[in-house]
Amino acid sequence: MGNIYTKDIKRIVKEIYNQYKDEIKDDYNTNKQIVVRYVDVKSKKVRNRIAGYLTRYYKIMKEKETSPTEEKEEISEEI
């Protein structure tokens, strides 16, 4: 079973992703440093949740960007 993240964590992650898209990677530790740098989080648990969801969100968005082109390539190969 996966974790369910609150609306606040999702909102913060989307804001970070939209503003600092170029700095975010698929590495958790790198994203944790980004969260420390740009978000004032007092709780270690919340910081880690934000960094974890940011990593997952990055992978999802990266997959969405590449999937339409892959489908077009598969269709053209079949023809």
Swiss-Prot record:
The record's section on SUPFAM superfamilies has: Rps17e-like
One annotated Gene Ontology cellular component of this protein: ribosome
GO BP annotation list? translation
Q: So which domain of life are we looking at?
A: Archaea
Query: What keywords appear on the UniProt entry?
Result: Ribonucleoprotein, Ribosomal protein
Q: Name one GO molecular function term.
A: structural constituent of ribosome
A Pfam match is Ribosomal_S17e
Q: Which InterPro entries match?
A: Ribosomal_eS17, Ribosomal_eS17_CS, Ribosomal_eS17_sf
Q: Which HAMAP family match?
A: Ribosomal_eS17
Family, similarity comment: Belongs to the eukaryotic ribosomal protein eS17 family.
Stated name of the protein: Small ribosomal subunit protein eS17
Tell me what organism the protein belongs to: Saccharolobus islandicus (strain L.S.2.15 / Lassen #1)
User: Source organism lineage?
Assistant: Archaea, Thermoproteota, Thermoprotei, Sulfolobales, Sulfolobaceae
